[in-house]
Each structure stands twice: as structure tokens, then as C-alpha cells.
Curated annotation (Swiss-Prot):
Gene3D superfamilies: 1.10.1410.40, 3.30.460.90. Pfam families: Mab-21, Mab-21_C. It comes from the Eukaryota. This is Protein mab-21. SMART domains: Mab-21 (SM01265).
Length: 365
């Protein structure tokens, strides 16, 4: 099919605009974040070294692989989460019966094996390994380590939370989250994935993702708040970061994500934080399902994909619901106020309208 010359010209201009935006705004954001990460990891590694001296079961897994750190997630340019992988689930079974959206529990396979667990004192009378008990112990150790470490003048524990959160030089927030890696397992609550009628991702990628497995994090779960569930303190939050990152390889998907995060940081960092980087990442995964062919992720299509994601975002904000990609029963907007979602919807619509009507909009955004 012949494409009219004027369409080719418009497309070329858009590709030029996208490339320029990546070179200017996106790379500047990445460089600033990279610099902050180096500072954050120096401080956290020092704190965790002190923790390990006090309690050898909490071994730091924060290692530098040519400037990349395993288990480090950028929440925003001034907020980070660092996952510390714990050893030996051992005699514990993974239980995911769907009663706790976004969460699961670890239960002793046999009551007689209690003493064989590395984490024996954190196992409840009912045989569950309590995420909250482990986190509480870890929080105490980190608080003591902050007072002893080399950076004690610039790092402080954030009070009034059960999470392990540090404030570095008054401007950077880091959450340190204990976790177990669950390789070779796939949760029942995500068993519907991939959808049979959608030809993405390729079966080989699906197999790799499921073999890689997922993580179980010791952190507060928004989905359980206010339910007074007896299991709430024992439950572990399911995380699919590695799976998500693997799915976003190929084509311009990673590039799209970088542009989305940059636009989010510059224009959608709103009161109540309804539009997180993780929401953008989730909507990008749904866009991959809507456009399963690789040719639809060529750089010529990048503008269409980004506009499509912003239109999805408006729809989610207006419906006040954004389902987790792997766990659709879990709503990423849970706990956000209707006012914050309404305000965000208006802001996103303004931004989308500019992007749809002005081919040179990225010069100003």
C-alpha cells in the first residue's frame, strides 16, 4: 500500500520529535536518577553491612552489576525501593487461595518441621511465616544500624510506618523491603495469564517468565487495609517486576516506558499520587496485548502507542479502577481519593489533548 508523502513527512517529524525528547528530557532524567542511585546505594549498603553484623540472616543482596543493582526499583526521581532477598523458604509451602487480593502466605508444610526453618521465631502458632514479624525485626535492626553507620549524619529512619523507610539528605526516600524469590512457581491468582485469545507474548517468553517466577515482599498491602483480616500481618505481597521487565523487551517498548515516566514526572506528579510510574508500566503492558505484532512497536508507531496509553489512563481514572496486569482482582487505585483521581483525569486529558493536536508538543512538554 502506498503511503501519501504528507503522511510520511508527518511521521518523520514525529520520529524526530520523539528522538529529540529522548535525547534531551529522557536522558537528563536518567542521568540525574543514575547519580542519585549511586548515592542511595552507597548509604544503604553501609546500613545493611551494620545490619548483617547484628543479624547474619539478613544478608544484603544489593550488588553492583556494572552500574545496575539487582532488586532496586525507581519509584520516582527522589523515591526508591530496594528489595533484600532472604535465604531459605525451606519447609514452607506457598499458599495462594485468592482470599487476599495481591497477596499470599507461606505455611509450614509439616508442624513437626518448625525447628528446621531458618525463621522459626517468626512462624505463628497456626504455622504461617509472618511477613509483619520479619519486617518488625528488620526495622529494629535498620534503626540501630542508621545510628552506627558511616552516614549517620545524613540518613534517618522515617517514623509512623511499619515499613522500613529511610530519608537520605532530607530529600531522598528509600524503602528497604525483605523478600523471598519464588523461582519455578506461578501463583494461582495469575493462572489466567496469558489470555488464550491474544497472540502476545510468544509462548517461549511465557515459559521464561513463568520459570523466572515472582517475588513475595514483606510490605503493607493496600488491598487488605481496613479488612481486619487475621491474615493481614502474615501475608506477603506478590511482585512480578522481573516478569514485567522481560515482557517489555523488544521493539520500542522500553523507550515508550522511559518517555511515559518522564512525562509522568514532569506533568503528572499530582496530590495524592494517583498516577505512579507503576500505573504507566501496567498500562504499557495492556497496550502490548492490544497491539501484539512486533511491527506495531516499531519507532514509526511510538507516538500512536503513547497516545493510546494516555487514552487508557483517562478511561481508568474516570472509572476509578486500574487492574494490576497479572492480578486483575487487585486495583492499583485502591486507597486513592475520588478527588485525586478526578483531578488527575482532568490533568491527563489536558496533556493528551496537547499531544493529539500539536505535532510539535514534545518541544514544550
Amino acid at each position: 500500500m502506498l503511503v501519501p508523502p504528507e503522511m510520511i513527512a508527518v511521521q518523520s517529524k514525529l520520529i524526530y520529535q520523539m528522538n529529540k525528547y529522548c535525547a534531551d528530557r529522557v536522558q537528563t532524567r536518567k542521568a540525574q536518577i543514575h547519580k542519585t542511585i549511586q548515592e542511595v546505594c552507597r548509604v544503604v549498603q553501609d546500613v545493611l553491612k551494620e545490619v548483617e553484623v547484628q543479624e547474619p540472616r539478613f544478608i544484603s543482596s544489593l550488588n553492583d552489576y556494572n552500574g545496575r543493582y539487582d532488586g532496586l526499583e525507581v519509584v520516582s526521581p527522589t523515591e526508591f525501593e530496594i528489595i533484600i532477598y532472604l535465604n531459605q523458604m525451606g519447609v514452607l509451602n506457598f499458599v495462594d487461595d485468592g482470599t487476599l487480593p495481591g497477596c499470599a502466605v507461606l505455611k509450614l508444610s509439616d508442624g513437626r518441621k518448625r525447628s528446621m526453618s531458618l525463621w522459626v521465631e517468626f512462624i505463628t502458632a497456626s504455622g504461617y511465616l509472618s511477613a509483619r514479624k520479619i519486617r518488625s525485626r528488620f526495622q529494629t535492626l535498620v534503626a540501630q544500624a542508621c545510628d552506627k553507620c558511616s552516614y549517620r549524619d545524613s540518613v534517618k529512619m522515617i517514623a509512623d510506618t511499619t515499613e522500613v523507610k529511610l530519608r537520605i539528605r532530607e530529600r531522598i526516600i528509600v524503602q528497604i523491603t525483605p523478600a523471598f524469590k519464588c523461582a519455578g512457581l506461578w501463583p494461582r491468582s495469575a493462572s489466567h495469564w496469558p489470555l488464550p485469545q491474544i497472540p502476545w507474548p510468544h509462548p517461549n517468553i511465557v515459559s521464561e517468565v513463568k520459570t523466572e517466577g515472582f517475588d513475595m515482599l514483606s510490605k503493607e498491602c493496600i488491598a487488605l487495609q481496613g479488612k481486619n483480616s487475621a491474615m493481614e500481618g502474615d501475608a506477603w505481597v506478590l511482585s512480578f517486576t522481573e516478569a514485567e521487565n522481560k515482557l517489555l523487551q523488544g521493539g520500542c517498548r522500553r523507550r515508550c516506558l522511559s518517555i511515559l515516566k518522564t512525562l509522568r514526572d514532569r506533568h503528572l506528579d499530582l496530590p495524592g499520587n494517583p498516577v505512579t510510574s507503576y500505573v504507566m508500566k501496567t498500562l504499557l503492558l495492556y497496550e502490548c496485548e492490544k497491539h501484539p505484532r512486533e511491527m506495531e512497536w516499531d519507532e514509526n508507531c511510538m507516538g500512536d502507542r503513547i497516545n493510546g496509553i494516555f487514552l487508557q489512563l483517562i478511561s481508568c481514572l474516570q472509572c476509578r479502577r486500574c487492574p494490576h496486569y497479572f492480578l486483575p482482582n487487585m486495583d492499583l487505585f485502591k486507597g486513592k481519593s475520588p478527588g485525586a483521581l478526578e483531578n488527575a483525569s482532568k490533568q491527563v486529558w489536558r496533556l493528551t489533548r496537547i499531544m493529539l493536536t500539536n505535532s510539535r508538543c514534545l518541544e514544550e512538554l
